[in-house]
Each structure stands twice: as C-alpha cells, then as structure tokens.
Amino acid sequence: MSQSTCPKRRARALPLIGASLMAGSWAAAPSRAVELPPQQLDEVVVTGERPGPGMWHVHRGSAQLWILGSISPLPKGITWRSTQVEQLLGSTSQVLVPKPLEIGIVRILWLLITERQVLMVRGGKRLKDVMPTSLYARFALQRAKFTNDPDKWERYRPIIATAFLQQAAFHQVGLSARLDLGAAVRSLAKKHGVRVQEVKIAGVGDVLDALKTMQPATENTCVEASLVTIESGLPRLMDRAQAWATGNVERIENLPEPAEVDACLAALDSGAASGDLIARVRRTWLESLVKSLQGGGVTLAVVNMDLLLGHSGLLDELRAQGYEVDAPVG
C-alpha cells in the first residue's frame, strides 16, 4: 500500500501533530540560558525505574495543592516510580490532569475521509514541490540521518512530515513522547478511588482549524525552527529528559526552551479560530488550579513544567494571588 493511502500512518498524524504543537510545551518565557555542547547523538542512557522530580506544594490555610511537573520527551527506557504519588493519593480529594488529545477509531476513519487534505500535500504534489528549496534540502539531510527511506513522508504537508521526522530523531537518541504522566496518574487515581478532573487544553478540532487556515510562510517558520531542534537541539532535550528522570528541577529550569516552541505555538495561534489559543490554555490551567485551592481539601495536579516555570509562569501567578509555593525537596 502506498504512503499516500496508508490509513494507519495517516491515523497517527493528528495525535502526533497535536502532541508536537501542544503537549510538548505551553511555555512560559525561557529561564536563564546555559551554554550547550555541540550536537552529539549518543543515546540517552537513563533506564529503569526513576522517581522523576519532587512535587511543588501550594497552600494557604487548609487548602493544599500538590503539583507534579511533566515534560516531553523523556528517556524511552525509564519507568516512572509512582510511590510518592500513591502515598499522597491516600489523602487526596481530587486529581487534575490534562485531557488527552485522543479520538476513537470511528472518528479517525471519518477524519481520514473528510480531512485528508489537511494532512497531505495537495494536488498530487510532493513535499519537495511545496517546501522552499533550502528548507527541503535541510529536511532531506536529516531524513537521511534518521531513516533509510529517501522518499519517506513525501506526501505529507511540511509541518506533519517534520513532526514525523522529529519523532524518528527522538527514537534514535533514546527519547520518547510515549510516557504520559497524566495518563499514569489518572490510572492511579482511579485505582485509589480518587475523583479525576480533566483539564481540556485543546481538542482535535483546534488542531484541524489551525492546520486548515495556517499560511505557508507561517508553517515554514515552524518547520525551520523544528529542523533547528533536530539539527542542533537534541543534546538539550536529552539533558532535560535526564534531569527530569533524576529529579533535577534546577537543571530543567536553567535549560533553554527548544527553538521550535515559540515559532510553532505562534503558528498554531495564528491558525486558531479564537486567535488566542495559547492564552486560553494558560488561563484555563490557572483557573483550574485556583478553583481547586478555593474548594479546600487536597488536590494533586499534573502540569507541564514549561507552563509552571519561568517569569510569569503558573507558579508565579499563584504566588501573586497570595498562595505559598514550596519548591520540591531533593
């Protein structure tokens, strides 16, 4: 079956681009930058059961909120040690987790019929026909490094093809976006009979709307920034992943954001019907956290670290509203 008609491959494209544009980093401004070594592609060697970082403790009076920070990608060989969270769940009244960007098989098949033009290059053209020559040359060079197929992803539009390439690069250096901390905590909460509240950050419709109206120049800006990450930013992502696995919050905070974040979030925002998707995500999370504190009791939340940290991150917002924020210990 040809690449352009393979339903399984196209079915993976929507969740993949959603994760690449949204779940990776709803970023606050980057913190202090550190000098990084030249690109080295040694595989991440953190394996086995790892604790991840400690939790932030937000409190005022009797209200308590524990926040577990997540990042993506993570070392593909690790298993998250959930002991601390399981102990906390014994006294927790509710859990806040991101609502997953997932769709059932019927919805996937319908989208493949109705939205194929959103994912693929139109008019029977190929990727090399629609990308600027210099940008395509860089894409092709990286594709040759991480795959054995010189025509791989040629039928996909640039932003989708680059997302696939990025995942291939992650896999080769020992990184994976498959460890879903929110899903893991959701399962633990259900096991312990704790109520789960899902915070919807965006849906498939948001991704489709953004892709439908995204201008080629804006898309190419995101693609170029993503290629920079693949070309020279993998050591930084590997360092962040190792820091998370070993609980080194300070290291994560000091590392700069991936180059693609601002460009790709801007691309998503420019294509979103509301025009303020990024601000809406930040506002939704802040409102959910504050509401949990106002309700009293003990809440556990899983929130992306890039949303938490940095100047005007969610932790700063909570401090500004008069809540005490204790940093993770250890």
Walk through the language-model features, giving the residues of each:
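Bacterial N-terminal signal peptides
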Residues: 15-25
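Sec/Tat signal peptide C-region and signal peptidase I cleavage site
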Residues: 28-33
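A cross-kingdom marker for long, charged
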Residues: 267-330
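Structured, acidic catalytic/metal-binding patches in enzyme active sites
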Residues: 34-48, 52-273
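Bacterial N-terminal signal peptides that target proteins for export
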Residues: 3-17
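Residue-level recognition of short, well-ordered coil/turn positions
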Residues: 25, 248-249, 297
